[in-house]
Regions:
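Histidine- and acidic-residue-rich, metal-dependent catalytic cores
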Residues: 1-198
Length: 198
């Protein structure tokens, strides 16, 4: 249900963000801060009424504005907990996009920082695969395709390229049809042969 999905979202974002951070060559301290930021990026949603914790296409502007306050709430809670400035910055920018279409500050590419760019991309990807109520979930392959084909201007090209290489053409969890017409679920990516997952 929705509660389980909301509980798993920070874990999903943390695991995938750490894998992406490593593939981008982030150092140990950066990975530590990224791990913390990924786990707490949505903690401010606890201050919202339950019906506003997930964005839906049917939200009216006033509800959308209230939903967007979860970013400031998350930063305030993280600050009170004494987290590092790098963590606070990543949490503050986890909905910012390279093309300026994000929120709350409508920042653009160079202003975002690598950690925030990773968090924004992985957050978007996980929400596409594990969406809020009333929204159809995409398979990992479909989510990657949509991000690359329709949303790539929102993300840093280096971060997005590394993400696609890391996830592979057929990301884990994708259902594929084999040459013998049987179906299989991809268990892992073969980075040296992306068209031949395991």
């Amino acid at each position: 249900g929705v509660g389980e999905r909301n509980g798993l979202h920070p874990i999903n974002v943390m695991v995938i963000s750490l894998l992406l951070g490593r593939s981008l060559g982030m150092k140990s301290e950066e990975l530590h801060d990224l791990r913390v930021a990924a786990l707490i990026h949505d903690i401010g949603k606890l201050k919202l009424p339950p019906h506003l914790r997930q964005p839906t296409p049917s939200m009216i502007p006033m509800e959308r504005t209230r939903y967007e306050t979860h970013v400031a709430e998350s930063v305030a809670l993280a600050k009170r907990m004494g987290f590092a400035d790098a963590v606070l910055t990543a949490v503050a920018r986890h909905h910012e996009m390279c093309d300026g279409s994000g929120f709350p500050q409508r920042l653009k590419g160079p202003d975002l920082g690598r950690m925030s760019q990773v968090l924004a991309l992985v957050n978007q990807y996980d929400r596409m695969c594990n969406p809020a109520r009333g929204v159809t979930a995409l398979t990992p392959h479909e989510a990657l395709s949509v991000i690359f084909a329709q949303l790539k201007a929102r993300f840093d090209s280096v971060v997005l390229g590394a993400f696609i290489r890391m996830m592979g053409v057929y990301p884990p969890g994708s259902i594929v049809q084999l040459v013998n017409d049987r179906y299989a679920i991809v268990a892992s990516v073969n980075s040296s042969r992306p068209l031949r997952p395991k």
